[in-house]
Amino acid sequence: MEKIIEINDSIIQISDLNDRIYIMKLGKDVGELIKHVDSVCNEKKLSKVFAKVSGNKKELFEKNGYICEGKLENYYSNDDAYFMSKFFEESRKISKFSKEAEDVLNYVKTVGVNPHTKIDEKFHLKIANETDAEKLSKHYSKVFKTYPFPIDDPNYILKTMQTNVKYFIIEDNGKIVAASSCEMDIKNKCVEMTDFAVLEEYQKLGLSKYLLYIMEKIMKDNGYRVFYTIARSISYGMNITFKKMGYMYSGTAVNNTNICGNFEDMNFWYKLSE
C-alpha cells in the first residue's frame, strides 16, 4: 500500500513497498507529528522514517532519535535543509551495498566537472503533456522493476503534472527512450531532478546528462535557486552525470528506497543556481 495523507498541515507518505514513512511536508506542530509518525511505525511495523527538515527543526528531530544523513545548503531563504532518518530496526541501518557504493563514490571523486553536452540529432526532447501520461508510465515500468512512487500509473503521472512536476522525455522516432522530471518546491524555489529512466539499449549516449542540462536551464529561467537529486548509490552513470554537471555530494541515506527490486542506499547531490 502506498498512501499519502495529510495530518493537520503536514503531509506524509506511508509506504509498504519502501517499508517506511516519508515526511514530505512539515506543518506547524512538529512535536505532535513526530509522535504520530512513531505511533504509525510501531503499529504497522515499518522500519524507517525519512524527512527533509529545516535547520531550526534539526535538533528537535535529533532529540527524538533521528540522525542526519544529508544536507542541502540554502534550501530555505535563510536556512539549510537536512535529511533526517529514524530507524526502527537495527537491520535497516546496515547497508547491503556499502562496498559497491564506496567504489562508485571513489571513482566519481576522480571525475572532473564538464557540463558540455549534446545528443544525436535523431533524438527529440520535449516537455511531456497530459497526452503522454500513458506511454510515459509504460516507459517507467520497462525500466524499473520497483520504484518508490507509482510512476508506472498514468493517473499518478497526470495528477503530479497538474500540481508541481514537469516531465521531460526524449523520443527516437516517436518512441520514448529516456525520461526524467523536475519536482518543484514552488514556495522555496528549489527543485529535485529525479525520475531519470533510460532504456538499456540507449544508455551511454549522454541522454541523462542532456535531460539534466535542459531541466536546469528551464528551472533557472523560472527562478529556481537550488537543484538537487537523490541518486542510487550504486549507479555509476547517475552519480557521474551529476558530478560532471557541477553538483556536490552531501551524504547518503542508508537502505532508503525500494528501487529495481532491492532496498538501496541513496546519495544526495545538490547545486546552487549561478
Curated annotation (Swiss-Prot):
Its EC number is 2.3.1.264. It comes from the Archaea. Keywords: Acyltransferase, Transferase. Residues 123-274 form the N-acetyltransferase domain. The keyword Transcription does not apply. It catalyses: (3S)-3,6-diaminohexanoate + acetyl-CoA = (3S)-6-acetamido-3-aminohexanoate + CoA + H(+). Disruption phenotype: Cells lacking both ablA and ablB no longer produce N6-acetyl-beta-lysine and are incapable of growth at high salt concentrations. The keyword Transferase applies. InterPro entries: Acyl_CoA_acyltransferase, GNAT_AblB, GNAT_dom. GO terms for molecular function: N-acetyltransferase activity. It is an enzyme of class 2 (transferase). Belongs to the acetyltransferase family. Catalyzes the acetylation of beta-lysine to N6-acetyl-beta-lysine, a compatible solute produced by methanogenic archaea that helps cells to cope with salt stress. This is Beta-lysine N(6)-acetyltransferase. It comes from Methanococcus maripaludis (strain DSM 14266 / JCM 13030 / NBRC 101832 / S2 / LL).
